[in-house]
Amino acid sequence: MNTYKNSLNHFLNLVDCLEKIPNVGKKSAFKMAYHLGLENPYLALKITHALRNALENLKTCASCNALSETEVSEICSDESRQNSQLCMVLHPRDVFILEDLKDFLGRYYVLNSIEDVDFNALEKRLIGENIKEIIFAFPPTLANDSLMLYIEDKLQHLHLTFTKIAQGVPTGVNFENIDSVSLSRAFNSRIKA
């Protein structure tokens, strides 16, 4: 029985909590707990304050389901954005990733889960904002292909254009490291050089 570890319940609880963060293992969690608890307690207090503020203020946009600190997100209330395109993504974090690219200036819709989609409200939004194209920005999987077909079927009466982001060979990756479906799609979706 290790009585030393038993005497550090609060510290070990912090390690356990940090370890529950995705992609953080036991060693990294221990290093973070040690740093925050002993080497930089001021940073720990700042993180605590920032975490509390985020939890108290974060919500999802009533229009697009993206993260927001207001009822309607800045993206949805920005009149300079293009109204003709709506980019559908699976998760709120996908909006962050696409916004960082600065390639898309339209609107978003975060699915979260297909069971939660209010197709009547979505249809009203598509008509009200004069959306002409839905861009599916989903990772390439058979399940997501089925999801796209399902959504297209539910909204086909609106006569929208449905597109999806291109798939292909990632930059700097050798063919032997690419699955055959991705390589085949890239080959069949080739463009003029």
Swiss-Prot record:
Family matches, as Gene3D superfamilies: 3.40.1360.10, RecR Domain 1 (1.10.8.420)
GO molecular function: DNA binding; zinc ion binding
Toprim domain segment(s): 84-170
Alphabetically ordered keywords of this record: DNA damage, DNA recombination, DNA repair, Metal-binding, Zinc, Zinc-finger
Zinc finger motifs (C4-type), residue ranges: 61-76
Listed transmembrane segments: none
Matching PROSITE patterns: TOPRIM
Gene Ontology biological-process annotations: DNA recombination; DNA repair
Superkingdom per UniProt: Bacteria
NCBIfam families hit by this protein: recR (TIGR00615)
Reported function: May play a role in DNA repair. It seems to be involved in an RecBC-independent recombinational process of DNA repair. It may act with RecF and RecO.
Family, as annotated: Belongs to the RecR family.
Listed name of the protein: Recombination protein RecR
Organism field: Helicobacter pylori (strain J99 / ATCC 700824)
